[in-house]
Amino acid sequence: MNQADTLLVIPSYRDGKRLIEFLPPLCAALIANAGQVRIQVVVDGSPESEQHWLAAKIAELRGDYPSLQPMQSYPQNRGKGHAIRTGWATAPQAAWLAFVDADGATPAAEVAALIAQAQAAQQPAVFMGVRTAATNKSVTRFWHRRIGSRVFNRWVQLWLGLKFTDTQCGLKIIPRAFYASSVWREAGFAFDLELLLRARAAGLPVIARPISWCERPGSSLSPTAMLALFAAAYRLRQNLPQPPTGP
């Protein structure tokens, strides 16, 4: 597929300062390693003052990085999934659709490498980063987040049958045709789960690539959001096709 036909969305909620630190190395890494990938920041209901400040900073960066698009925003917090879908709607011609978290926990080089891998693929597939210490990658996580992630992913394996060690890593890339074939419902953090479940139902391979990761303070995944994620997983099991359980 044409390298230029890739759109990377960065959903951001109260994350402007870390995002502005992340954008220059990200833009440079994409130019050097993944062709002309368009980058679309979507601000998911951050305070108005932050939205104005961030829009001005992005406008300045666009002078050096034309692939960085004007910022999108809306006044109310609607959730990560809603922000991603809002951004993806801006490029109906893109062959590949990607997203990455705004905090810069995923190194820019890892984002570029995964996008380049997808662009070089001979067959459609979902590509996602996974954070695992069982590789030569450097993964630094806060202890409570590490334990919570293990518990959640084990529960997802049992409840939804998704055989992945890390469903919630904020770096994923999917083919546009796959995205266009479904009506998407999850607006929050459960968008990742919906994506993987729909890929399984469609028979689309999922390629998991170990990545380096460095946890950043100030995560927006609160205990309330985690409970909502468990509730969404229950809802998804009721509403989406499940794999066969026997012969």
Roles of regions detected by a PLM:
Residues 1-4, 11, 184-247:
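Hydrophobic helical membrane-anchoring modules
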Residues 7-11, 40-41:
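Short hydrophobic beta-strand elements that form part
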Residues 15-19, 46, 80, 104:
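Donor nucleotide-sugar binding loop of glycosyltransferases
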Residues 15-30:
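Short, well-formed alpha-helical segments that are part of the catalytic scaffolds
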Residues 35-46, 72-74:
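Short beta-strand/loop segment that forms part of the nucleotide-sugar
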Residues 43-54, 104:
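A conserved acidic beta->alpha catalytic loop
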Residues 74-78, 82-91, 96, 108-178, ...:
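Acceptor/aglycone-binding surface of glycosyltransferases and processive sugar-polymer synthases
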